Design a protein with these regions (language model features):
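Rossmann-fold cofactor-recognition segment
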Residues: 16-32
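C-terminal substrate-recognition "lid" of short-chain dehydrogenase/reductases
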Residues: 173-200, 205
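Conserved mid-core segment of classical short-chain dehydrogenase/reductases
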Residues: 52-69, 151
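Hydrophobic positions on the long internal alpha-helix
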Residues: 48, 78-86, 124-125, 183
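Catalytic Tyr-x(3-8)-Lys segment
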Residues: 158-179
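Conserved glycine-rich Rossmann-like NAD(P)H-binding loop of the short-chain dehydrogenase/reductase
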Residues: 1-12
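Catalytic loop of short-chain dehydrogenase/reductase
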Residues: 68-72, 76, 81, 95-133, ...
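Conserved Rossmann-fold SDR core element
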Residues: 122, 131-146, 193-200
């Protein structure tokens, strides 16, 4: 079941995946809507949470605190609501996989908010792994990946950014969505890992 706050993203994902994929638009910032969704969904095996708006990259002096709160609303409080209402419906042997990012481990200038959110999610992952055991709880920490997370940048500037980052990495390229998907699948299948953050960054933290 694919869920997004925006119906068009749900339909786009369904078309991309094909087969018998199903989806539903749910306002993930609305606690009651999230709770109702999981009640109606019933039992399932794995919860993967990847929601996030385009990154707001500003130095602290220029940071809009309203936007900063919005980032935490979507990327932390919405996660907490999804786990709170979703975890009781997870079958035995199931798991939860959250999404963080290398901003928490290797922040750049202007990344105050993304770094704060990522660090918070990594701490939450460890705490939930203890509290929700035996449900496994892990996180994936992507590096720079070609996704709409960077759509606030001008297209030409964004492409230069991708090229510059790619040249600096040991793998000589930025990530693609399918690179990151493999990490989520691994954590869903790997039954002896919990409380872990798997970094898939092309070597970003090394350089």
């Amino acid at each position: 079941m694919i869920v997004s706050s925006k119906a068009e993203r749900v339909q786009e994902a369904i078309r991309s995946i094909g087969g018998d994929a199903r989806g539903q638009a749910v306002d993930v910032s609305d606690e009651k809507a999230v709770g109702s969704f999981f009640t109606n969904l019933g039992v399932f095996d794995h919860l993967v949470f990847t929601a996030g708006d385009s990154l707001q990259l500003h130095e602290l002096a220029e940071t809009d605190l309203k936007q900063a709160r919005r980032a935490f609303e979507l990327r932390y409080w919405s996660v907490l609501a999804a786990v709170k209402y979703g975890s009781p419906h997870i079958r035995s042997g199931g798991s939860i996989v959250l999404t963080t990012g290398i901003a928490g481990q290797r922040p750049q200038k202007g990344w105050v908010i993304p770094a704060s959110v990522c660090g918070t999610i990594e701490g939450l992952t460890r705490a939930l792994a203890i509290e929700l055991a035996p449900i496994r709880v892990n996180a994936v920490s992507p590096g720079v990946v070609r996704t709409n997370l960077w759509q606030n940048m001008d297209s030409a500037e964004r492409e230069r950014f991708y090229q510059d980052i790619g040249k600096s990495l040991p793998v000589r390229r930025v990530g693609e969505a399918h690179d990151i998907a493999q990490a989520f699948l691994f954590l869903m299948k790997e039954g002896f890992s919990t409380g872990q953050t798997v970094v898939v960054d092309g070597g970003t933290v090394l350089v």
